[in-house]
A protein has these predicted regions:
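Short, conserved SAM-binding/catalytic segment
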Residues: 1-2, 245-258
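Core catalytic lobe of class I
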Residues: 1-233, 237-242
Length: 258
């Protein structure tokens, strides 16, 4: 049986078989894209996981209202969307802020984003992360109940300024800088903890269980801990499994304010 808040150093397709049916509230995973140098022995882990058995496990272990959130880019985005068109709903854009691809800058635009594919069976938990903004002031029509030639629909009225809100709903673009700081970069395809925290806050509630079947260096586990969620993780590489476990130990050892 699978324990919560633990990473397993094994093939995720085998490990997920031990997760009870309908027990996962949300999946956040950065699957291998198979875009790194295929001749580099250090990135042999970057191989696409067969979609059919992967989706078989995803659909079995998740609750009906669980969001399945998968990172992708380029042709892998198309493959990912077509791997389960029945459950695919929409894509988010991760704006990395920093640009890459300068060697090809005279041939194509600089790259600054990756895709995030969102799948689900039924409408999932959705907690929109409101964005602070300047209060939106609009003129509000206040009628007196009398009809006039000024406006045949609303009658005589005066306009009064009304403050609508100092928050706005989030868009499909999420801007979070990549983690480049020495001591915070552990994996070549590492995603920012802040980005995963944003996704976890949006698509789950405190106490929920988050699955990441390609845990890498443990960013999803760190994000889950900070957002008071449980996690289940799998990582095939012993090197990155060890790094993830060490990061989790360091995170749990940090003093909290509460």
């Amino acid at each position: 049986m699978i324990e919560l808040n633990k990473i397993y150093n094994e093939d995720c397709l085998e490990g997920m078989k031990r997760i009870p049916d309908g027990s996962v509230d949300c999946i956040v995973c950065d699957l291998p894209y198979e875009v790194l140098n295929k001749n580099n022995a250090n990135v042999q882990w970057d191989r696409i996981i067969p979609f059919e058995p992967l989706w078989g496990q995803y659909e079995r272990v998740t609750k009906d209202n669980a969001a399945i959130i998968l990172f992708a880019q380029g042709m892998f985005t198309a493959k990912m969307m077509l791997s389960n068109p029945k459950l695919w709903r929409y894509n988010l854009i991760w704006d990395k802020v920093a640009k890459t691809g300068f060697l090809n800058s005279k041939r194509m635009p600089l790259r600054q984003h990756e895709d995030i594919c969102v799948f689900y069976k039924q409408l999932p938990t959705y907690n929109p992360q409101m964005v602070k903004c300047e209060p939106d002031k609009r003129n509000h029509s206040k009628g007196d109940g009398k009809h006039s030639q000024k406006n045949s629909c609303y009658g005589t009225f005066v306009e009064v300024p009304t403050i609508i809100s100092d928050e706005k709903y989030p868009t499909s673009i999420i801007s979070v800088s990549k983690e480049h700081t020495i001591g915070h970069f552990f994996h070549p395809t590492q995603k920012p903890v802040a980005l995963i925290q944003y996704l976890i806050r949006t698509y789950s509630n405190e106490g929920d269980t988050i699955l990441d079947n390609c845990m890498g260096s443990g960013s999803t586990a760190i994000a889950a801990i900070r957002e008071k969620r449980n996690f289940i993780g799998f990582e095939l590489s012993k090197e990155y499994y060890d790094k993830a476990c060490n990061r989790i130990k360091m995170e749990l050892a940090q003093p909290t304010l509460f």
